[in-house]
Amino acid sequence: MVSLEARVREVKGKREARRLRRSGEVPAVVYGPATEPIPVKIKRSVLEKIFHTISEATPIQLIIKDDQGNTVAEKTVFLKMVQRDKVSETVVHLDFYEPTKGHRMRINVPLKVVGKPVGVEKGGFLEVFHEEIPVETDPDKVPQEIEVDVSSLDLGDVIHARDLKLPEGVKCLLEEEEAVVSVLVPKEVAIEEATEEEEEAAEPEVIKRKEEEEE
C-alpha cells in the first residue's frame, strides 16, 4: 500500500484552485458511498514521486492533516480520476474514492502481458486492445494487475475477455467475446495467402476446361 499525505482545503473555488497550482499544490477531493466529499490539497513534489508507481487499482493510505500538521483522518482510498491540463498535460485535479466494506466497486485494473507469441516469430505483431480491464470486486479483493500469457498465440489467434483468469469474486465487465489481445497477420502475408487461395481455387477450373476441349 502506498502512503500519501494531504492537507484539508478550507477554501474552495476555481480561484483558490489556480492559486494552489501556482504554489506547487494539486487540489483534490475524497468521496465514497459513506464519505461526504472532503476537499484536500497535495504537494505536487510529493505526488510526482509516487505517481508513476500507482494505478486505479492501487490502495492508497491517505493521511489527511490540518494546516497545523495535526492528523484529522486516515483513509484507504483509490485514485478514481485524474484531470490534466489540455496543453501541458500536468495534473490539475485528483479524485480519491473511499470504498465501503461490503459495497462492491467498479475499477480498472492494469493488464500485464507476458511471453512472446509464436506468431510474432513468424512475422505477426501483437495488438493489445485493452491496457486496463474494467472489473467489479470487493474493496479488499482488488487485484493489482491481471496477467495474460501470450506465448502460445499464433498468427490470427485472439484472447477474449472470457479467457482471462481472474481471482475469485472478481467479475470482468467486458463482453465475453471482447478481444483483449491478438496476434495480427501482416498485410503482405494476408495478401499472399489470399492470392494462393485464389490460384488453388482457379486451378481445377483450368484442368476441367482442358478436359472438355480434348473431348
UniProtKB/Swiss-Prot annotation:
Keywords (A to Z) from UniProt: Ribonucleoprotein, Ribosomal protein, RNA-binding, rRNA-binding
Top-level taxon of the source organism: Bacteria
Signal sequence, renumbered to the chain: none
Single annotated GO MF: structural constituent of ribosome
GO cellular component, one term: cytosolic large ribosomal subunit
Gene Ontology biological-process entries: translation
A Pfam family: Ribosomal_L25p
Biased composition (Basic and acidic residues): 205-215
Biased composition (Acidic residues): 192-203
Annotated spans, Disordered: 192-215
CDD domains per record: Ribosomal_L25_TL5_CTC
Keyword Cell cycle carried by entry: no
NCBIfam families for this protein: bL25_bact_ctc
Subunit description: Part of the 50S ribosomal subunit; part of the 5S rRNA/L5/L18/L25 subcomplex. Contacts the 5S rRNA. Binds to the 5S rRNA independently of L5 and L18.
Function: This is one of the proteins that binds to the 5S RNA in the ribosome where it forms part of the central protuberance.
UniProt cross-references to HAMAP family, sorted A to Z: Ribosomal_bL25_CTC
Similarity section: Belongs to the bacterial ribosomal protein bL25 family. CTC subfamily.
Protein's UniProt name: Large ribosomal subunit protein bL25
Organism: Thermotoga sp. (strain RQ2)
